[in-house]
């Protein structure tokens, strides 16, 4: 009788504990979020599109690339066939990604450099990282940001830009402009892929001699392992990883890993440039080998992060997204411009979301736009009520969780292209000119140029 009473009391005690969770215990149940977005990674450059279960669902051929980790990840994920970068250029997309706004509202209508003071991430809006931070998340940014107007604020050389070229493109982002990111290992923009540099949380510069995606994946893994006690293990985390490759340059082994280049070096160009609108005789055609090599290297770096999540037991409660800021035409469409155009090669970006036991692996033709990403990420993390009122994008988390959700799907996606407008006497751009506006549906693309 006494033992039965002890069991009963113990059970009641356990019930009471379960009914009175501490804030920390509740917080621990919030999902972690990792958003990985290499630069200039087109949607077609993923091997799984040519595999059974995928190829019959799309109307394009995949590039002949090797992406074994993305192949496996796709079979565990919701994969969008038609995610679009509305203004397919680095800084404007990043502005939309962070704010949930189109370029005319985010503060970033043009690529950021020191001649464009009108193009810089707004300080007076809550970015996705601000919302996560306010919800109790540890927030970390790794890699390329390219969302700030460069100023002469080099921590190592006060009063100077972080680079000597004019205009300056690279930038140091001080703590008061990091929008809730409490851990920082990032830079503005810099295109020496095996000679990258980063500023850490305290402004110290690091110059590793390592291919940047692999270096960044290593730093992310150190963060996940909490080496150096860099995060609060009681808090969920929100991580953004802005890898630079396969962004140009893509012309030598200085730009990619040799082991990846060897997969493509002996392939005839017309066996690599297989899109029906591609021209293997263009001067740029040789670049495809280095571009695809970088794609394969990014795949490997991404896989290392996935392996660490599993090893640490974090994979089940972590939302992982793989995407890009825009695509790459790579000898298609008779243009030398790799981006900033209404073509599918430029606008159509990867968008894969894995959330084990919460999101069913499948394909969906949702035409997700750049401003939709921020509110959708917040919705996936259970923070729909915290989406700022000024966000222009839509929260498609209900559709991600349930493909039959009663939600209006977009009929298409806007296309936006801006160029420099009026300049002052010092050559600074003081306005932008809307050079093209358009609309892309599942079947048609309309783009009007001025």
Give the residues covered by each predicted segment.
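Formylglycine-dependent sulfatase
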Residues: 2-5, 9-13, 20-449
């Amino acid at each position: 009788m006494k033992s039965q009473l002890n069991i009963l009391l113990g059970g009641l005690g356990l019930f009471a504990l379960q009914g009175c969770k501490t804030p920390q215990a509740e917080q621990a149940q919030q999902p972690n979020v990792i958003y990985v977005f290499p630069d200039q990674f087109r949607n077609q450059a993923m091997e799984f599109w040519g595999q059974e279960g995928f190829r019959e669902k799309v109307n394009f051929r995949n590039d002949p690339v090797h992406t074994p980790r993305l192949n496996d990840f796709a079979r565990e994920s919701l994969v969008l066939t038609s995610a679009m970068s509305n203004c397919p250029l680095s800084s404007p997309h990043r502005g939309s990604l962070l704010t949930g706004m189109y370029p005319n509202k985010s503060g970033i209508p043009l690529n950021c450099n020191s001649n464009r003071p009108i193009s810089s991430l707004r300080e007076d809006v809550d970015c996705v990282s601000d919302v996560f931070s306010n919800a109790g998340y540890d927030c970390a940014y790794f890699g390329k940001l390219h969302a700030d107007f460069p100023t002469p604020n080099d921590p190592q050389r006060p009063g100077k830009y972080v680079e000597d070229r004019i205009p300056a493109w690279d930038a140091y982002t001080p703590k008061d402009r990091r929008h809730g990111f409490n851990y920082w290992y990032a830079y503005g923009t810099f295109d020496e892929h095996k000679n990258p540099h980063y500023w850490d949380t305290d402004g110290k510069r690091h110059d590793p001699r390592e291919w940047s995606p692999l270096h960044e994946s290593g730093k992310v893994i150190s963060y996940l392992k909490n080496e150096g006690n860099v995060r609060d293990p009681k808090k969920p985390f929100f991580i953004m990883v802005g890898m630079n490759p396969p962004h140009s340059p893509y012309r030598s082994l200085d730009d990619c890993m040799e082991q990846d280049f060897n997969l493509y070096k002996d392939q005839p160009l017309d066996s690599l440039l297989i899109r029906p609108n591609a021209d293997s005789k263009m001067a740029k055609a040789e670049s495809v080998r280095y571009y695809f090599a970088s794609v394969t290297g990014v795949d490997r770096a991404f896989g290392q992060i996935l392996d660490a999540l599993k090893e640490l037991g974090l994979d089940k409660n972590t939302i992982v997204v793989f995407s890009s800021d825009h695509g790459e035409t790579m000898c298609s469409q008779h243009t030398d411009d790799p981006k900033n155009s209404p073509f599918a090669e430029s606008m159509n970006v990867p968008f894969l979301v894995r959330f084990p036991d919460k999101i069913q692996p499948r394909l969906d033709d949702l035409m997700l736009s750049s401003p939709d990403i921020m509110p959708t990420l917040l919705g996936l993390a259970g923070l729909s009520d915290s989406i700022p009122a000024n966000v222009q994008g839509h929260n498609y988390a209900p559709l991600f969780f349930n493909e039959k959700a009663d939600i209006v799907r977009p009929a298409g996606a806007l296309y936006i292209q801006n160029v420099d407008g009026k300049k002052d006497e010092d050559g600074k751009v003081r306005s932008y000119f809307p050079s093209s506006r358009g609309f892309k549906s599942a079947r048609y693309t309309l783009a009007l140029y001025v």
